[in-house]
């Protein structure tokens, strides 16, 4: 064991989530292995028994049995399984005779590790960027607006009269993007602007937080940040009094 792992922190995270359904899913599995052939990781590994979905969620039952008294090496095993051996596609659940939502259990373990400060570095950085700037790429408001204006100028050379309205109140559609677009792929924004222009659509983009429609916080089950990201978008939509939010991600 190691003092670096706090059993109380583990149990404090799990206990509020241990409702009747959670307990049923953890306890009811009969290890029938009907989920095995539904898992692409299992099939791609040459049918390694450790890749069977039911086996992957054994950690939860173990954590509860040990009351969180595990070492860092054990947490590393959990990390490797929940991030590199499962992408939560839910195919296994469709074939489970008890309907055990293995993806939910995997997500719960991701949330647990996130609460302990353990998550892929790229995702951790993106989540911090959301908190600081409202988007995963840490694009400032000034850079975002400047990029939109540049996209309008470039695209209008091909479609005469093309405009990319910013903060147009009462527009029908508020368009949101993947934050990688203004950072690396502004041409994607131009192509959409051309479509809207030719279609004669009434649209706008927000200048403030809410224009990034990605939500990488979901992948590490950081529920608070995931909620903040969604709320940013809908808050801006309400402020601009638009009728629809278009999300391409």
Model-derived features with residue positions:
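Iron-sulfur-cluster electron-transfer modules
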Residues: 16-17, 23, 61-248
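Ferredoxin-type iron-sulfur electron-transfer modules and their immediate structural context
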Residues: 1-85
